[in-house]
Amino acid sequence: MTTNTYDVGDVVMAAKALRNDGTYPDPAISIGEILVEAGTRGQVINVGLYLQEHIVYAIAFENGRIVGALERELEAAEDAEDATQAEPAATPTAAAAAEGSAPAAVLVAEKVPAEPAAHGAGGHAAKTCKHGSANCKSAAADAEPAVPSTPAEPAKAATPAKPATPAKPAPPAKPAGKTVGAGTPGAKDGRR
């Protein structure tokens, strides 16, 4: 089993520029665009697995983006003194959350830019969804005005079907001969 090098709360740096591989949720950022420059500091907020063998870290970087990164794309901060200065602005809140005054979910919400509340909330006028697709069915449904539905005409009464003709009954089985038991030929000693 693989073990993770970094734990939640550790301060790390991007070892190389991290680019959008198509999984970053902001449609304004195109595939291949740099999300995080090399050397940018961030804090590990989640540790998970990809394909059950690759450890992936969710990192809240200083530029406000939360990006998933593999272990080989990260490196430890140079020294602990710089790491304490480079922690995100929500660190005092993290200490308060540890004491029970604020839930941990609030910490993440303070660092993450707000997402649109509804599907397609960012582009009703252009009829595109938040993913940037112009032909998204849900975006078209969001953009269409609500029209009161008119009741459909009642369906015509169906004509009665012809009664099914019953199949001819099978003739009764004819005994092949007297038998004593199932499949046993008749007795040969004169009994009937």
Curated annotation (Swiss-Prot):
Q: Does the keyword Phosphoprotein apply?
A: no
Q: Which organism is it from?
A: Frankia alni
Q: Which UniProt keywords apply?
A: Nitrogen fixation
Entries under Pfam families matching the protein: NifZ
Query: What name appears for this protein in its UniProt entry?
Result: Protein NifZ
- Superkingdom of origin organism: Bacteria
Q: Where is this region: Disordered?
A: 77-102, 117-192
Q: Which GO terms describe its biological process?
A: nitrogen fixation
Instruction: Tell me the InterPro entries matching this sequence.
Output: Nitrogenase_MoFe_mat_NifZ
Q: Does the keyword Acetylation apply?
A: no
Name the protein family.
Answer: Belongs to the NifZ family.
Q: Where is the composition biased (Low complexity)?
A: 85-102, 150-165
